[in-house]
């Protein structure tokens, strides 16, 4: 009897277990797919919403090169992403000693080599905070999309500032080249020097041959003294090529290189087709060929071009052809998304576009050349409160130049140099004007940036800026975060709507304000805005080339592990 009772109890327990298991597995079978489907649909919904609100924005650049505003929608194609490119992500960046001690205090608090995950989050958070604080500082967004665009521009700017390098602290000590090898490709001549051979026919009716003398500096201007040349605004490519060939850390073995320099003169390549009726295939051909040539190199394939640098001596928009037939598509090619591009004007939503100073007429060789010039312009008596060298843009109703010219010529404290009659082709005319003025008006011209900004700065003339895209959102490595140290900002919109008189605003600046700005420009900024010649030997100063390559090496060290 005992045995039968135990057996009956055991069977009851077994039946209960089977029943519970059956219920459990039926729950899994019928409920989990529904839950999975619910969360998947929720994820898709959130992703779609985020994509609309964050990844797409619409910005327009006005230029006389285009009949209509030149507009870009970020997020619409691979070249216009707000989210960082494959090789650089805000959340994925490691902070620490990459932050310049000279500039961004907001990034300085992140400890070096400690809690790397926390550092990534901290850097990302700090950049997000800065973007939120500053996105409407200069331009008041008129739509949500424009607000996102401005935030993105600020984020990329501060990420670029995080690559600032103070250089060797003791410039008198021998430079260490450990981990700083620079390799210069020996490209077939069709990609560089051959483009200069037809210098009398690059632009129809214009002979550029004199500008290619002296390694791209142009002919010497003897009446201005030592180190002054008639340098063309688009001469950056041969100037930097000549200089990098004599870089103190140049290596001749690819395996020893940290940075690879590609001397393709893309600016001259695209310039020769600007005013000729040729097909888009012709405009794009040489750029595609240089990428095919590079793709045959293991050094290019190893890091997908992330450690490669191109110098393009024109504005970024000349290499981003979209609907308008102007220019090439070189910077829109997928292979060009990873390399670093040095340009005189960058695309503010491309983190690997780096803007560096326009070439000026001054190319010192020694510290003494710089010091002598600093002393001269600091002691210069300036008879004009303000000046403007330029021409009107009557075919562009959005340009403020006509209003500025009108305000200038109606004041006895403003001097206007009309560039439409070729007065500005003589460098001495422009430099004399700037050295004789306290403030120099710098409105946008064919594009947002102006070579004249740098001509005025090296002349000790305080630039007056009307849009942040002229300087503040451009030259992260060469101009400081605080624009008030070296410039005056007046809203372009205020001028356009004639709510302000620029001359009257500048009259209100105190003697101390002007003295402090001029001193900062001449003593602190000037050496880093000029390109020394290929034999330059600087011990006290770093010129624009030195700053650029110090920062490039830091960027690449952070991007390529």
From Swiss-Prot:
Residues 1-31 are cytoplasmic. The chain crosses the membrane at residues 32-52. GO terms for biological process: protein glycosylation. One of its GO terms (molecular function) is glycosyltransferase activity. The keyword Membrane applies. GO terms for cellular component: Golgi membrane. Glycans are attached at residues 87, 253, 277, 418, 421, 557. This is Probable xyloglucan galactosyltransferase GT20.
